Amino acid sequence: MAIDLQQDYFSLFGMPRRFRIDESALEAAWHGLQGEVHPDRFAHLPDVEKRRSMQWATRVNEGFRVLRKPLSRAQYLLELAGVDAAIDTNTAMSPEFLMEQMEWREAVEEARAAGEVDELEQLHLRLRQHSREVHAGLADALDDAGDYPAAAETVRRLMFIEKLQHEIDDALEALEN
């Protein structure tokens, strides 16, 4: 078996180039490819073949890691479309979103400072629901509208949301210990 190391991850796994994917089919394709390219299958072959199998296995695992998570999958789709989401440099967000983030952060900090585990758990649930809504908007922007600038902004929003979810998790862990 030979893997084209130049093909995109969607092609590698036989998936359509879309944000909405069948995650079970992705996992099944990953397991199938892993079985074909696993370095143990090439242990008896010359070093050049062993190295090639390591490259293939690395490519398969990296592709799965990227496509498995919605946020990295969206970033990858933007990259394939030639859109720079400017994740590291463009943090400009709408005033409404920034105000919303400030409110979320204040609520988390107040609950943390007061030691209110129940309130933090409620905030986590509300934020998870909000994240689902934003993901749905991202799917619409990428798959239905092909609106890459909106998708790039939504990716940046999701990064804020994901970071806040981790902060809530950390606060809960600190309070429960």
From Swiss-Prot:
What Pfam families does the record point to?
Answer: HSCB_C (PF07743)
Q: Could you give the subunit structure recorded for this chain? A: Interacts with HscA and stimulates its ATPase activity.
Q: Which Gene3D superfamilies match?
A: DnaJ domain (1.10.287.110), HscB, C-terminal domain (1.20.1280.20)
Per the record, the similarity remark reads: Belongs to the HscB family.
Q: Which SUPFAM superfamilies match?
A: Chaperone J-domain (SSF46565), HSC20 (HSCB), C-terminal oligomerisation domain (SSF47144)
Q: Where is the J domain?
A: 8-80
Disulfide-bonded cysteine pairs: these are none
The entry's protein name is Co-chaperone protein HscB homolog
Keywords in alphabetical order, please: Chaperone
Q: Which GO terms describe its biological process?
A: [2Fe-2S] cluster assembly; protein complex oligomerization; protein folding
Which terms does the record give in the GO molecular function aspect? ATPase activator activity; protein-folding chaperone binding
InterPro entries hit by this protein: HscB, HscB_C_sf, HscB_oligo_C, J_dom_sf
What the protein does comes down to: Co-chaperone involved in the maturation of iron-sulfur cluster-containing proteins. Seems to help targeting proteins to be folded toward HscA.
